[in-house]
């Protein structure tokens, strides 16, 4: 079968590698189709993995070749020596290794000689002494060369019968000093170098053209005649040199080349003037077959020395054809199957119509076996032997080495079918050979199986809670079953975690007379009395706070405005900054325990878990928070103790964090294998046994956990590869023991596009004789999990790792057998507390939720007021708080009631494309980002709108405009110009540095214009949380700073900002503009999402519970702020527009073309030079499959250079921080560079854009490649 074809009219030589290289040189005496007289020497890698059609070395030479020879590797010549015989009588030697590496013909040249007086027609290296070279040419000249000495050659002696031309030389394969020559004299001479003379010569009726020695017998050789009238192949035994042993006929014209296979004496190949290449059995004297003919003389044919299955034939039709002895190509009839005449001729012209024809079928020696045995897939043993009649007998029988394996897999299979792992769990707990850690895992699984997740979580927190109430924990009922969550009497455990009923206190009624005489009061008290009597409550509160009368201020604030309440609240926390109770009050009053989960001492992890259970809004929220608690336990020390490990495992199991759990189990596999090998267990005698048993233990725990949590879907998520690798390996091992059905059940857990899955399924189906089932598993690249931190995956039993800022991807933290399994730092997250209820107006049903992308909320263009100071904010913090929710924007009045929210919106899932634009997981370790603690929440009020949610997608209602046009998924973000309001031009820096600052809000309207009352409000409770106490009153719930913004009654597409016009709305401007959110998609990004795709959720834990309706519109009124370049506010259709205010546009800076670097200012030039030089250093080292990532990285960095050149994006502070990043990268301090880069994104998010992912990728690639 044809393997390759080289379009060259060249002679050639193979090297001695198992996958051989081939050297070719333009043959002398041939006329090219273009009449070229040039000549070249080339080396080809026929079996290259890249399937390249180009030579690995090529160079022009002055003369053409008659022959080429390639020696075996020798001392100092790792790839041997290449010798060329030129038509001008020159012989030249080259070092092949030097040719390939340096590509320099002159540098690789070892020796060059013109000892021959005429053309050199043939040469060959001694097979037994690789440094000895034999050459022959015109004038009967024969020379022997020593490539070690590189001196003048020696002649073997005088011939008995002189020859005019030597056409072929051949060394004896058994005796190193014997060789044969043949030429135009009609004789074949046998020479002995020791005696330096011709010792024998053979003759026949026709002239000989070539000669070859028997591979193993020193006295036998074969010759061929070049006579066109009588082309013969003759075998000789020199013991009787008078006549040939065998005469073989088949060629129709003279034979030009012979080669006797070194590995099989019964195979000989020949080629000649009849354009044919034939295969012979010279021992039996019979023709075996014929290979496709060429279009001209086939002048040279040779087997590959170390790969005899391969041979090549060179012909004067300009081709070197590489073929295999065996032909496995389909028959001609199957290649051209069309019945149409025209199609037939079209196909036949491009189809290989010639095929080898074998008259005798004979296996080569290397394939012959009198008997053999082999292990078959599925624990089978196949043996082949010969019977008395020399017929092969094949036996296939099962082979079972370890009966314990069969028993183990059988029990595992039964547990899977019945979905009951209790027997396995009990057996593993009672097995004394298991380690304490492993037993602890099985005991936890047993407990989880007995009481379920809720009961399991009760047991975690019940001890601390019930001890505080003088009770003993009661996890299960008398019959051992888990009590229902809603038993009669409202005895649910989590309901009891709420506040106990407050002991009633009689209402205070003032009695008796009192004096308000201020004569004997202090000046401060006098001021307070006067303010109270003047009904100036707000001023009185401020005066009380100034006089440290906190109790009086608190009482006064009860009926004051939300701003006053917030001011008093912050004053309280400021005065009690170091008090732990105050810190807890802060978290409890805000109904947000993010601060507790993130910062409380993990030594009190059970108390933290109890708080998580009490305050979580839903199961997903609870899972994410308790998983984060597990991460903190693991990371509390560099070497976590067994107790810490078990405590973290409890949290992970309670939080459905399958990937976290599996990563711990997989990381412990090597240690478990080691303990098995050291144990006296009779079932474990080899490392292979230990590996299977440890992997089986992992699979049992994994499947038991999935059974307990009722997870029936396939595995999914961006970090499942280590688990999938382990499952695939175990399935392979189980199938190797013949358990095909069990192995296939494991494979059903894997995503359909997982690498190696299709091959393994096909192998199992073939071995079991069943058809491959159509995979119903989802693709890991076509279905994506929700984008959130440590939240519960849509797939039960699998958790999704944290969402990282920007384009940072997930990477393994340490090298393990399955990759990416070492302890990973917990990423920061922002949790979603319970959603408060609020009044709503009657609304018609909402239209069905569309699959189109929701319209992004337009940020306020009027700036934001100064927030109240935060007692817990760190000193020197930046003014920007990425986790602070934006202030609400008051909805505009509408002509008709807006549609009601009929149900929860569909969760937004991003469509994961395993994008080439994402940095691969294996490139870099993941680093956790610091996160801010939650902001305090102001007291509840029936405000017209809730705060916008920075971490949840805006909900879509039926009043929005049509879908946005398709476009790019990412756009460079630019800062939105803001105009400060009259109320907030002097916000202090200290006030802006708040991590825990309460969100800004509107006051509830106190009256309605024209005396028309608003519709009767209906109070809706938030979705029921099975883990939190029931709310006593919906009006007392605090506002939720992380809840999603309520849809406005009418939303229109944001308009393009126009210079000289200010937007106007009937309701007046919003005094509180939302802060910039660096992690939410810009309006442009959302509007340009492809149609039919929902943009990714950006909330840490997804949207807050639905079931709420929009609040009534606020009172119309207010004064427009100073005009400026603004974005058109969304407004209702019947909103009246204010007259535009003309503005003088600011002077524009010159814009330089993309790619120009000549105008980069001095302050920024360091950034450009540093990053550009680093890019050029990284690019050559990037693996081929990541080239696209590198190209995208460079493209994005060019966006940064363009911004630097135009000086139009980065502030001086941002440039200074970027310089620090560059300095850290230059110093190869990649950890510092990464942290500085994250800080840059946090502090200057509005100045990032298309270029920022390029910088992140550059740092990662530099760390991985330099």
From Swiss-Prot:
It is found in: Cytoplasmic vesicle, COPII-coated vesicle membrane; Endoplasmic reticulum membrane. One of its GO terms (molecular function) is structural molecule activity. Residues 463-492, 760-1157 are annotated as: Disordered. It comes from the Eukaryota. The keyword Amino-acid biosynthesis does not apply. GO terms for cellular component: COPII vesicle coat; endoplasmic reticulum exit site; endoplasmic reticulum membrane. Residues 826-838, 1000-1017, 1031-1043 have a biased composition (Polar residues). WD repeats lie at residues 5-45, 60-104, 115-155, 161-201, 203-246, 250-290, 293-333, 374-397. It is a peripheral membrane protein. Residues 463-475 have a biased composition (Basic and acidic residues). Pfam families: WD40 (PF00400). Transmembrane segments: none annotated. InterPro entries: SEC31-like, WD40/YVTN_repeat-like_dom_sf, WD40_repeat_dom_sf, WD40_rpt. Keywords: Cytoplasmic vesicle, Endoplasmic reticulum, ER-Golgi transport, Membrane, Protein transport, Repeat, Transport, WD repeat. Residues 883-907, 1068-1078, 1110-1125 have a biased composition (Pro residues). Gene3D superfamilies: 1.25.40.1030, Functional domain of the splicing factor Prp18, YVTN repeat-like/Quinoprotein amine dehydrogenase. Component of the coat protein complex II (COPII) which promotes the formation of transport vesicles from the endoplasmic reticulum (ER). The coat has two main functions, the physical deformation of the endoplasmic reticulum membrane into vesicles and the selection of cargo molecules. The COPII coat is composed of at least 5 proteins: the SEC23/24 complex, the SEC13/31 complex, and the protein SAR1. SEC13 and SEC31 make a 2:2 tetramer that forms the edge element of the COPII outer coat. The tetramer self-assembles in multiple copies to form the complete polyhedral cage. Interacts (via WD 8) with SEC13. PANTHER family: SEC31-RELATED PROTEIN, SECRETORY 31, ISOFORM D. Belongs to the WD repeat SEC31 family. This is Protein transport protein SEC31.
